[in-house]
Amino acid sequence: MGEKTGRTGKLARSDKRFLFWSVAVLALLIFSLLAPHLASHDPYEINLSLVTAPPGSEYWMGNDYVGRCIFCRLLHGAARSIFAAVLVVMLSFVIGTLIGTVCGYAGGRIDIIVMRLVDAVQAFPNLIFSISVAAMLGSGLKNCIIAMVITGWTQYARLARTKVLDIKKKTYVRAARVSGMS
């Protein structure tokens, strides 16, 4: 285990591109988490006297066509995007793992029906399917998250099911069943 960690650390130190992008992603995460403290203006505040104002000391990236601070909008947008991404991954993981575990453990008709549903969802590219579902649900961050979770849980379900089926075949599980402990 320590050997793998050593190799990963060595890769991180030797590969300049990896190091650059790691620092860039870390900086983006920090800036987006600190958005409420870094943004000096309300990102939704309309100021018609500052329409398309150039960048300056007060408005670092200037203003848009209705006078809103572009830098503040960028920070708040990044924070919302990262929140949505983390939420989609967490929900997809929890839902997919639960469904996959139940299917792998129960087997039979439940497993067959759910895995055919997984096959049907995975037959379409995730992005196109998510956009289609979001179009049916309507606009908004909540509906976008729901659409992405609907397409994202399938990978976790398939992986969890495979692991459960693998563990069910292990000798110690069979021995526990034979001895009446299961």
Regions found by a protein language model. Give the residues of each.
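Hydrophobic alpha-helical transmembrane segments of membrane transport/permease proteins
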Residues: 31-66
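Lipid-exposed faces of alpha-helical membrane segments in multi-pass integral membrane proteins
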Residues: 20-34, 87, 91, 95, ...
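Transmembrane alpha-helix signature in integral membrane proteins
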Residues: 70-105
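Alpha-helical membrane-interface segments at transmembrane helix boundaries
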Residues: 13, 71-83, 111-122, 138
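N-terminal signal-anchor/first transmembrane alpha helix
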Residues: 1-41, 117
